[in-house]
């Protein structure tokens, strides 16, 4: 038995060495490292592609974009500081109806702010909403991310949290705010966000009481108007040469909103989203619609499923229009290689500012995207004007 066992083992070894000897060294090495190779291809693609730093901001405020870009260029892993700087620059300058304009109160005349920041590496998110009395809401949102296990703080409690960390509280409403509110009230409180109440919110200021359900009307819904230079939200996206993303958004809220309303800037996936493995996206427009559909999140997930940035942006705006035919707004999408695209609806064209990127045409260049004609209900999408189509060599494998 022992002799038979030894012979059997020798036969197996002989067959094994004969098989290995018949396999070329290259093939043997390939099979030995196959799993490692497959993992590398899955994670990184077959070719190593250089990533250029990129800073994108919504609308056409070039000064704020340049300030954020200058921070991004100070060294590696500066994406967080860059998007924060961009938000602070716009909060302390005149960017649309943000705080410096003092022209976006709620119906009671209060100026409340919201902001959010997201880390594309950890997927951590920090935000505040309905916060009154603290100027740079983005700093408080960043503090929520860094110093708490929460994602969003709201209202007076967010203000109290900010004070506990040493942020100065100040009275934000001034004569400009009161004048805006006075004109609105003298115009019958038009426009407003009420519906199916009595007296008719289309003609009266209230107070209102609910109509019986059988009296509810369903007129064509007019979305919140987004006008160049009159918007109340801005978003920033930063990508560095290591492939790290941060996105941030800051808003003074919809003008003449009902007190207590939370906007898209504070809701994960609505105004901003980023994942280093895939890319990032920022959206701007009617915040109540954005919160229902989470377009920034949808855009990133569309890229995860294999869509190029232009097709992802197109897909998202089509989704919004399918359910909200009067939607006003836009989405800007960036993949992990730094290729970007945008799509929009409800405007003649949407502007956003780009610094860096593969083309390096210029810093703080204003890109323009022509929006769709509503009657078509199809996004022609993609770049227009200075915005180049995606070269074949730059497409993600």
From Swiss-Prot:
Residues 1-22 form the signal peptide. InterPro entries: Ntn_hydrolases_N (IPR029055), Peptidase_T2 (IPR000246). It comes from the Eukaryota. GO terms for molecular function: N4-(beta-N-acetylglucosaminyl)-L-asparaginase activity. Keywords: Disulfide bond, Signal. The keyword Disulfide bond applies. Transmembrane segments: none annotated. Disulfide bonds join 90-95, 189-205, 344-371. The keyword Repeat does not apply. GO terms for cellular component: cytoplasm; lysosome. Gene3D superfamilies: (Glycosyl)asparaginase. Pfam families: Asparaginase_2. Belongs to the Ntn-hydrolase family. This is L-asparaginase-like protein CG4372. The lineage of its organism: Eukaryota, Metazoa, Ecdysozoa, Arthropoda, Hexapoda.
């Amino acid at each position: 038995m022992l002799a038979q066992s030894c012979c059997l083992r020798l036969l197996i070894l002989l067959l094994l060495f004969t098989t290995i000897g018949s396999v070329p060294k290259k093939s043997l090495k390939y099979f030995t490292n196959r799993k490692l190779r497959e993992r590398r291809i899955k994670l990184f693609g077959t070719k190593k592609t250089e990533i250029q730093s990129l800073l994108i901001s919504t609308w056409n405020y070039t000064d704020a974009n340049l300030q954020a870009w200058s921070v991004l260029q100070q060294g590696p892993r500066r994406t967080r500081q860059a998007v924060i700087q961009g938000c602070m620059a716009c909060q302390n300058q005149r960017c649309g109806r943000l705080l410096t304009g003092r022209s976006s109160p709620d119906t009671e005349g209060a100026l409340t702010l919201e902001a959010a920041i997201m880390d594309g590496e950890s997927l951590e998110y920090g935000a505040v909403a309905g916060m009154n009395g603290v100027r740079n809401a983005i700093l408080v949102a960043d503090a929520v991310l860094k110093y708490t296990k929460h994602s969003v703080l709201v209202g007076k409690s967010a203000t109290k949290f900010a004070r506990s960390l040493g942020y100065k509280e100040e009275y934000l409403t001034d004569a400009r705010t009161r004048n805006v509110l006075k004109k609105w009230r003298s115009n019958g409180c038009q426009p407003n966000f009420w519906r199916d109440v009595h007296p008719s919110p289309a003609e009266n200021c209230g107070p209102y009481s609910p109509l019986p359900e059988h009296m509810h009307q369903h007129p064509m819904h007019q979305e919140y108007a987004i006008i160049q230079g009159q918007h109340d939200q801005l978003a920033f996206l930063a990508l560095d040469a290591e492939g790290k993303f941060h996105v941030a958004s800051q808003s003074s809220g919809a003008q003449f909103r009902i007190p207590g309303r939370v906007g898209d800037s504070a809701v994960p996936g609505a105004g901003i989203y980023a994942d280093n493995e895939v890319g990032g996206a920022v959206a701007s427009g009617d915040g109540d619609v954005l919160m229902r559909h989470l377009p920034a999140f949808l855009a990133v997930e569309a890229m995860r499923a294999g869509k190029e940035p232009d097709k992802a942006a197109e897909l998202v705006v089509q989704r919004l229009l399918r359910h909200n035919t009067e939607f006003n707004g836009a989405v800007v999408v960036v993949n992990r290689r730094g290729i970007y695209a945008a799509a929009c609806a409800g405007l003649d064209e949407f502007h956003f500012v780009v610094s860096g990127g593969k083309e390096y045409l210029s810093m703080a260049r204003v890109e323009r995207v022509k929006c769709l004609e509503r009657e078509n209900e199809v996004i022609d999408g993609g770049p227009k004007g200075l915005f180049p189509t995606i070269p074949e060599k730059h497409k993600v494998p």
